[in-house]
Amino acid sequence: MSEFSESYHLRGIDIKEGVALLQRAGLKGYVFPPKEGWISIVAEGNSFAPDERITAQNTGTLLHYVSAEDHGWSFALFEGKELRCAYDCGWDDDVRVDDSRYSPEALSRALGAGGATAVAAAEEILHPTDIDAAIDTEPARVFAEAMRLPRFEWFAYDYVAHDFHESPSEYVGVIKVAP
């Protein structure tokens, strides 16, 4: 089975900021305690694109991250409601890259200290030459690690909604949000 992950990562140190974002958006979801300066969020309604209900309510720095292991990956970085950086790479038939909204400066700002170095390391995987290179280099993982995302593998609303009740000990500190 292929991994499909879709999540939001809000820059901050107070879990209440993530809860408030989902509440303003009127969506169900789960908010994870801050780690590495990111508050990880999964929200109902996965569409593999940033949900306008969330981005329209954003007041901070928010990263939308998608990894569809055998198909491609993408990210979009928002500062407030404004899209500041985006990238999409797919490889269903041929490798397709859309980096028309890519901005290393915006990613560096989001990371703060050491951001430029981390972004430079991740840039090596942004333009795969063929499908094998796109899969073998694990670009989504490399990017997520460079961005210091605390959670990104097998991380989506449906997975968390199922596991939250099945394995509560793995979700200590996680807040379930209902509109």
Where are the predicted features?
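A generic structural motif
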Residues: 29-36, 63-69
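Short, surface-exposed beta-edge/turn micro-motifs
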Residues: 3-6, 35-39, 59-61, 72-73
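Charged interaction segments
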Residues: 43-179
